[in-house]
Amino acid sequence: MGINSKSFKNFSRLDNILIIGNGGRENSLAWAIQKNELVKKVFLTPGNAGSERISKCERIKIDINNKKELVEKLDFLKVDLIVIGPEIPLAEGLADFLRKKDFKVFGPGKDGAKLEYSKSWAKEFMRDANIPTAKFWKVNSLEEAKSIIHLSSIPLVVKADGLASGKGVFIPDSKEECIRATESIFNLSLIHI
């Protein structure tokens, strides 16, 4: 399914889009969005070396943590839609802040982003909403985790709660590896098995 003018029928203007992020996800979004005939310019901040190779795209520097500067730049660039790619600004409530400033934003608010940034909250949400999900335990100490590991059978999955840049999930082949994985991430946050 492509992005065409019908995809954006609720927008009175769609000249300038800002995409926040610097990864392949953001470049893919920029590539798809720039194909729409309504879009004149796609700004990426910070973008990456490949961003400017995409038609209609320009990398710009905006400190998204400096809210005053961000709002000023968005107004100056006459941005019609902001797309937030990375999880961290979503988890920190950037989409909520921008919506309160009357900007159109594609990306969940802080509460919606919690499904991504908190593994324990997401699992509890699925359980409470009767959404099928694997059995899980939430532990608060390494000793508690080891006890569950010893009483369980492999395969087990060990997950750090919170954002871990894609590095917080382990699928060990043995209980010993499971304990090592648990030890390696336990100081970062709560772990889930």
Regions found by a protein language model. Name each.
Residues 133-138, 156-185:
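Glycine-rich phosphate-binding loop of ATP-grasp-fold ATP-dependent ligases
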Residues 99-109, 116, 122-129:
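Glycine/small-residue-rich loop that forms an oxyanion/phosphate-binding "nest" at active or ligand-binding sites
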Residues 1-111:
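ATP-binding N-terminal substructure of ATP-dependent carboxylate-amine bond-forming enzymes
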Residues 82, 191-193:
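Conserved small/polar residues in nucleotide/adenosyl-binding loops
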